[in-house]
Amino acid sequence: GYSSAASDVYKRQLIAGEEEFNEQKVEELTKSINKFAANVDKNVDVNFMLVPNAVSIYEAKLPYNVKSTQRDTMDFVKDNLSDKIRFVDVYDTLKDNVSQQLYYKTDHHWTTRGAFIAFTDYAKAVGLDTDSVDYDFMSVAGDFQGTQASNCGIYSSYDNVNICVPRNSKGSYVVNYIEKTEKKATLFDESKLGEKDKYLVFMGGN
C-alpha cells in the first residue's frame, strides 16, 4: 500500500485515516444531540443515523496493525442517546454489502449505492413504505476524482458518479435552499458536472 499524511491507499482504495476514539469528545457531541432533541416538539419523531466511513467498512483492506475504532464510537453514541431519539444502525448492513462499491475509490464520500443501501435500513426503521417504488441508477460522470486523489497526488483512478431516481414516479417535490433563498424541483444540479468536483451534482454540495 501507499501511505501519506492525508490518506492511505490499500488494495486500490484511497482510505482516509481516522481519529482514535475520544470518549470526552464523543460525549460532548452526544450531549449536543440530546439537547437538540430535547428542544424539539414532543410530537415530532427524532431519528439519528450515524454513518461509518470507508476506513471502518473496508477494514479488511487495512494492514493487520491498523484498526478502526468507529464501531466503539457508534456504540458509545447509541448507548448515551436520550430515549426520545431513535438510533438507526446501518453498520452491519454496510458491512454485509462490502462487495459493492459503497464508497468512492478517490473520495471520502459514500457512493449513491452506499447511500441507497443505508436508506433502505432507515426506511424500515421509521416505517416508510418503499416496496411500491422502484429505482434506477444512472451514470452521469465517469471521470470523477475526489479529494482523496488530490490530497495524496494519485490520479490514475477514476470514479463513476451515479444518481438514483424513482422509476415511473408521478410524485413531485420542492427542494428549499434556505441560505440561497431559492427553490428547485430536483435534488441534482447538472451544471456541476462540468466542474472538477462532480460530487457537487448532489444539491450543489454541502
Place the predicted regions along the sequence by residue.
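Single conserved hydrophobic/aromatic residue that forms the stacking wall/gate
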Residues: G1-A6, Y10
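Extracellular serine-dependent O-acyl
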Residues: V44-P52, K67-Q100, D121-K124
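Catalytic core of nucleotide-activated saccharide and alditol-phosphate transferases
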Residues: Y103-T106
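Extracellular/periplasmic envelope-modification machinery, especially enzymes
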Residues: G114-N206
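Conserved, well-ordered alpha-helix/loop/beta-strand core segments that scaffold catalytic motifs
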Residues: L14-F76, F202-N206
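Short glycine/proline-rich turn/loop motifs
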Residues: R12-A16, D96-Q101
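Short active-site-adjacent helix-start/loop capping segments
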Residues: V9, S56-E59, D96
